[in-house]
Amino acid sequence: MMYLWPQAGDIKHLPSGFGVMSRPSDNTIPQGVQEGRVFAIDNEAFTRGFDPERFFRFLEKLAPYRNQVLFVVVPDAVADAAATLDLFEQWAPQIQARGFPVAFVLQDGQEDLELPMRQDFTDWLGDNGDEIDPEDDAAFYAAKGQWEGDCVAFDALFIGGSTEYKLGPETAEFIRWAKRLGLWVHVGRVNSLKRFRQFQLLGADSCDGTFPCYAPTTAARRLSKAVGQPTLFFGGEPC
């Protein structure tokens, strides 16, 4: 599993399993990005609050590096799935129109709501000329899986939410669903080797956290081991 290092840090010394998590408030092109590292762009809703003008100005600045972008985090509301869906509908099209892949942030309660799709299931069936026997469960689930793959409205699933929700069974199922569709899965706030290992085993592709901001030397050492030799770590040593 890849680790996305905070933008402000120097990552020249880190191995290839590290990318960059960039922030609009830094207002500079990260050194790691200039060196060719892959990166993601945060919306800062969790830390500073989303600032549309600053956010889109930053996207414009990073447009020449679009081919290195893993995802742009669409604005979200912490621990509120319904509000996050509204924000996604408002802001995702504007980000996609600029040629960037987008990440939908999973928040508490999403299991009771519909995920963002470009077309609803009934319309998709009509457009594809498919008629499903209501008694044929296998045909129904096969068609639904194809519809999800064709119509999912985002490129990456960002695991947010409260800590309790993030570690719960609903989130694990969403990760499995996303991987079946071939989506990138990123986990926020990963600050221990135990949690790194947990989400790696679930199939997540990348993660980030705050520990490098407070103890960069220790974080670089421990995370380099976790990224390079992840199967060796099962415990909860802080990282």
Regions from the PLM with identified roles:
Residues G161-T163, N191, R195-P230:
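Glycine-rich phosphate-binding active-site loops on the catalytic face of alpha/beta enzymes
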